[in-house]
Amino acid sequence: MAQVINTNSLSLLTQNNLNKSQSALGTAIERLSSGLRINSAKDDAAGQAIANRFTANIKGLTQASRNANDGISIAQTTEGALNEINNNLQRVRELAVQSANSTNSQSDLDSIQAEITQRLNEIDRVSGQTQFNGVKVLAQDNTLTIQVGANDGETIDIDLKQINSQTLGLDTLNVQQKYKVSDTAATVTGYADTTIALDNSTFKASATGLGGTDQKIDGDLKFDDTTGKYYAKVTVTGGTGKDGYYEVSVDKTNGEVTLAGGATSPLTGGLPATATEDVKNVQVANADLTEAKAALTAAGVTGTASVVKMSYTDNNGKTIDGGLAVKVGDDYYSATQNKDGSISINTTKYTADDGTSKTALNKLGGADGKTEVVSIGGKTYAASKAEGHNFKAQPDLAEAAATTTENPLQKIDAALAQVDTLRSDLGAVQNRFNSAITNLGNTVNNLTSARSRIEDSDYATEVSNMSRAQILQQAGTSVLAQANQVPQNVLSLLR
């Protein structure tokens, strides 16, 4: 080897090896400090790609496991609501069994039907209001797709069904029996303006009253809506201490006013606070059907209208007072008598399917013949259910039963079977979700282990590599110092 000064090849060789050991030491320290064998693609390009795919799968499967747990929660929420519906159905069945006993009177059946109706209403409420995260789970047929995998198409479906009294076939369930309906002409009396003026009129009290002296009404009669009594402020001619408010009687045939009960002294407490209605003129008034006829005409009902007194007779011969009604042909419309003797037909206000506010006339009918019902869109509903109902927002409303339900227990059993079927499906899908969660957990564990073998550092190997690199660094540094001294040997030739 030539002795040269310009180029120190030994030093260059040593520097190169020192750089290599420095790089190896840096790599070992990086892997030991991060815990990863692959810190960038340069460490292992193929391994980095494989590990990245594993990471995507692991993250996706972990989220899928959470999705499956959400699916279990939805199924549990739905089944909980179905359990409550089932409880109501069991009570309805119990009531139906009770109603089948011939010892029940018709009023007993009315009471039983009242609870059945309330139970069915509660079923409808549970159906319409039960929700999970804003999703109404029993309000309509629906399929919820739960993503339980890391890739497209890896799903489990939850099939939900609309469960209410209508879909269960119980919306017209009725155990009542039809009453025998009868009517009689109604005598309606009211109070209207007449020529019999009572202002400042004088009248004779009974002999047991104020001793036959003249009394004079000073002002208007007062009427108490609460008690149905009349009161008047009376001035007694020639009397002392007898002036004041008295209860008076009004003869409905001629409007004659007399002291009530032979009163001899005015009311101790004065005029009752509830006596607020002014009555200046009194007359027996015949039923005024003007308002009722206008309502019938507006509803498209034609025919002669008359006011009747309704009565209902059950199978045991018991008669129930049905109040007033307006009769047109064979139809009866529930009616109310106003203070002035006018008759108005009871109505139900609702929102139509086009969003407009409308009014329907209350008709007497239903399975018992005396329930107030309304006809809307060709369907018949109980007036109590249709009152205030929004058919645009909620088009489905249970119709009123027109007849007594045949084989009610069979219908209820079919409804229970329908609920049981859906509950079974929900129970099965919960078990399926549990199985999916277990499988997802196992898969995540296996993929995590596989990714670890690819990208995690082997500390035994890396510590050994670091130690080797450190030793090489120390040795290289020492040798480099010696290699740098080689050109100095050439100087000895120049001495």
Curated annotation (Swiss-Prot):
Induction: Inhibited in nutrient-poor medium (at protein level).
Disulphide bonds in the chain: none
Superkingdom, natural source: Bacteria
Subcellular location(s) per record: Secreted; Bacterial flagellum
GO CC, any one term: bacterial-type flagellum
A Pfam family matched in the record: FLIC_barrel
Gene3D superfamilies: 6.10.280.190, f41 fragment of flagellin, C-terminal domain (2.30.220.10), f41 fragment of flagellin, middle domain (2.170.280.10), f41 fragment of flagellin, N-terminal domain (1.20.1330.10), Flagellar export chaperone, C-terminal domain (6.10.10.10)
Keywords linked to the UniProt accession: Bacterial flagellum, Secreted
GO terms of molecular function: receptor ligand activity; structural molecule activity
PANTHER family in the record: FLAGELLIN
Miscellaneous: Individual Salmonella serotypes usually alternate between the production of 2 antigenic forms of flagella, termed phase 1 and phase 2, each specified by separate structural genes, fliC and fljB.
Function, in words: Flagellin is the subunit protein which polymerizes to form the filaments of bacterial flagella.
Family membership noted in the UniProt record: Belongs to the bacterial flagellin family.
Name of the protein in its database record: Flagellin
Taxonomic lineage from the root: Bacteria, Pseudomonadati, Pseudomonadota, Gammaproteobacteria, Enterobacterales
